[in-house]
Amino acid sequence: MILAARSICLAVVLIGAQPAIASDNPSWLNKQMTFKQARRAILRAGWQPIRSDDRDHDYGVVSALHHKGVKEITQCSEGESFCNFYYRKQNECLRLITIGEQLPALKVYDWTSECPDE
């Protein structure tokens, strides 16, 4: 009985330590936005960019955006160029996914509550 109670307490502590997730449907974010509009809205809502590793930004869209000060970009696919950007607000994470190959043309494709691999 005591062992079971300790296991439950440990589970509660571990669950409490996990980051919470962002709202899956924030009213201030939509798929019609450009990346610049979405980024502005995300920052106004109190989210902070999660800075990615500078060593991973030596090519294409990722490099161009990183050099323009968009430090939260983590990767872009080749071809249609889906890009990932990560933000944090307290213990919540927000992953913004865009589509496009150049900054003015980047559009919001989707978003999730995923945290980057750390």
Where are these regions (language model features)?
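Short N-terminal segments immediately surrounding and downstream of signal-peptide cleavage
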Residues: 23-39
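A short, surface-exposed interaction/processing loop segment used at functional sites
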Residues: 99-118
